[in-house]
Amino acid sequence: MNFNKVFILVAIVIAIFAGQTEAGWLKKIGKKIERVGQHTRDATIQTIAVAQQAANVAATARG
């Protein structure tokens, strides 16, 4: 919950200051956030794959 409040506050501050600035600055920040999201997605997919393999090994070891 606290993260949501901080995120909303940061978004409002960016919106206020970005109102009169060029779009390039905001676009760069958006691309960085998008890249972080992509890395998070990829890491999650890899973690799920490793967990599934570990579960398969554990099931095979049990018989």
From Swiss-Prot:
**Extent of the signal sequence:** 1-21
Query: What GO cellular component term, any one, is given?
Result: extracellular space
Protein name, UniProt field: Cecropin-1
* Location(s) in or outside the cell: Secreted
Predominantly, its location class is secreted
Main function: Cecropins have lytic and antibacterial activity against several Gram-positive and Gram-negative bacteria.
Which InterPro entries does the entry mention? Cecropin, Cecropin_insect
Which stretches are tagged as propeptide in the UniProt entry?
Answer: 22-23
User: Arginine amide: which positions carry it?
Assistant: 62
- Disulfides per UniProt: none
Which keywords are on file for this protein? Amidation, Antibiotic, Antimicrobial, Immunity, Innate immunity, Secreted, Signal
Q: Name one GO biological process term.
A: innate immune response
Record's keyword annotation contains Aminoacyl-tRNA synthetase: no
Which gene carries the instructions for this protein? CEC1
Family, per entry: Belongs to the cecropin family.
